[in-house]
From Swiss-Prot:
The modification Phosphoserine is found at S568. Pfam families: Ank_2, zf-CCCH_AtC3H23. GO terms for biological process: regulation of DNA-templated transcription. Keywords: ANK repeat, DNA-binding, Metal-binding, Phosphoprotein, Repeat, Zinc, Zinc-finger. GO terms for molecular function: DNA binding; DNA-binding transcription factor activity; zinc ion binding. The keyword Metal-binding applies. It comes from the Eukaryota. InterPro entries: Ankyrin_rpt, Ankyrin_rpt-contain_sf, Unkempt-like, Znf_CCCH. The keyword Cell division does not apply. This is Zinc finger CCCH domain-containing protein 56. Residues 211-221, 580-592 have a biased composition (Low complexity).
Amino acid sequence: MCGLAKKLDIEDTLTSLSDQENESLAKPMNDAAEWEHSFSALLEFAADNDVEGFRRQLSDVSCINQMGLWYRRQRFVRRMVLEQRTPLMVASLYGSLDVVKFILSFPEAELNLSCGPDKSTALHCAASGASVNSLDVVKLLLSVGADPNIPDAHGNRPVDVLVVSPHAPGLRTILEEILKKDEIISEDLHASSSSLGSSFRSLSSSPDNGSSLLSLDSVSSPTKPHGTDVTFASEKKEYPIDPSLPDIKSGIYSTDEFRMFSFKIRPCSRAYSHDWTECPFAHPGENARRRDPRKFHYTCVPCPDFKKGSCKQGDMCEYAHGVFECWLHPAQYRTRLCKDGMGCNRRVCFFAHANEELRPLYPSTGSGLPSPRASSAVSASTMDMASVLNMLPGSPSAAQHSFTPPISPSGNGSMPHSSMGWPQQNIPALNLPGSNIQLSRLRSSLNARDIPSEQLSMLHEFEMQRQLAGDMHSPRFMNHSARPKTLNPSNLEELFSAEVASPRFSDQLAVSSVLSPSHKSALLNQLQNNKQSMLSPIKTNLMSSPKNVEQHSLLQQASSPRGGEPISPMNARMKQQLHSRSLSSRDFGSSLPRDLMPTDSGSPLSPWSSWDQTHGSKVDWSVQSDELGRLRKSHSLANNPNREADVSWAQQMLKDSSSPRNGNRVVNMNGARPLTQGGSSVNPHNSDTRESDILDAWLEQLHLDR
């Protein structure tokens, strides 16, 4: 009995031991399943941004860095897989900003921990999550020490796996610039900065979690020194649909001229509240507002003081204030190709999307504007030449031209290029010295005394040449000229070069003199001073001495475009005769034949043309006896009973030149021969020759005085 009882006690002991072992083995298995379920709930709370549920579910702080399986789509592969993730990774993936802040409040949290087959970090998850709060999460992770240079299993850094929301296309640029920085971004920069070059606005808000979608709004203040801070709007102000707002991507609002000279420059006339980002006009206090480059002379170079916060010069600064003033400047707008090409979806793009949209660059400046030096030089030289040509009497260019100086694109009323090209204007005729000598001589003074008798038959041909020369400078002829009608800095120099290189141009010295600034200024001053005192080449009745005749010839020479040319072919002989004479006489009145009198127009050739019209095609140059008589009587004292001729100079010359035996001779004003007091004619050979020369000189002087 005792043995049986002992055997039963041993069996009971073994049974109790086996039950305890089974219980001890089953407890860890139950704890593992319970922990796995608990950790999965923790990851769910992290994905939903539920801070309270995450805090209740977190039983131990050591679980912060634990890894659990998370069902998600594998990156770069269209399939769903289970991957190991920490709570910080899941919260960063879905943009759960509150949970991320709660996890980072524990010092045990590891920021750069990598796990799973892809070896991703929390920064990789935040960059590839495409959440609306991804920028905030990335900045927060970087601010507490996350390393943006850690590669994953495929060698990709966080910047290489960026995925952004389609509602915020401009977010990629911001994230790329932030993640490329190797330095840690501090919290004070996040709170104080308001400019990265772009500002963001909320597009829509979810009623479930209050999260907002961000998109690139407009360019605001210039970049701060670190260039990483942006301004956020937690919610977007809802505006009613306004059909009157123009589409800034189509129509006239997308043209180059509007973008450069009107976009965000012209003030908006809408008095009601509307969306500024969809309006192409400027509004008070708008960051995108810019100065008119036609009124304010500034370059496309960014202002260094404005980048630091403010510029003391304000609108008078010579540099660009902001991104819009820099890239919409006529010197830089659409001078480069857009990297996105035709697939660009920007509302306002500063670049060209095809080669046809590229604006031409000027070789002298390397920008889309002409050189200001070339523009001013062309404008000054053209104005000087136009002024000189218009003030010259008898010049074909004296007629009023519809010529205006070229307008500078960056100056007053200036136009930039491509769409703001040079205005189409008529070009004044280039009358350079030494060219068209025959036309110059026709415009100089011409009278019957200067024309030899054998050349009188050529007057009709001279008149035809003068009319032909006038027709060549008429507007009708200039319209059919091969000379280009557009005036720009390049072809103006070509016009002068072509004129100088032409075969009819021979005086190289005159070119350098006429194109020099000193010659042009001196000529203009002389023309203005002598404009009122200019007389007709034939109407010289106010000139009573050879000195006045010389001054008159000098005035005619100064008024000619060819200042160094003689006034007429006989000018040299006239100067020699006037220099050798010291005679003076009074004005005897005018009794010249009607055909030799000057006309009202003052043209020396008009009498010959009128003869041709009145007498037929053949000109009668014979001298009638009655005309000769009138010519003689016109200079006699009998024809002027009220006036006495001053012939003292002739008597003095006769006394000085005559011999003692003929010293008592006097001059008969009606004849051409010397007479003695007794009336008999004395004709010694030497005396007759000398007296004949004196009378010839006297008659020539009378013709000159008339």
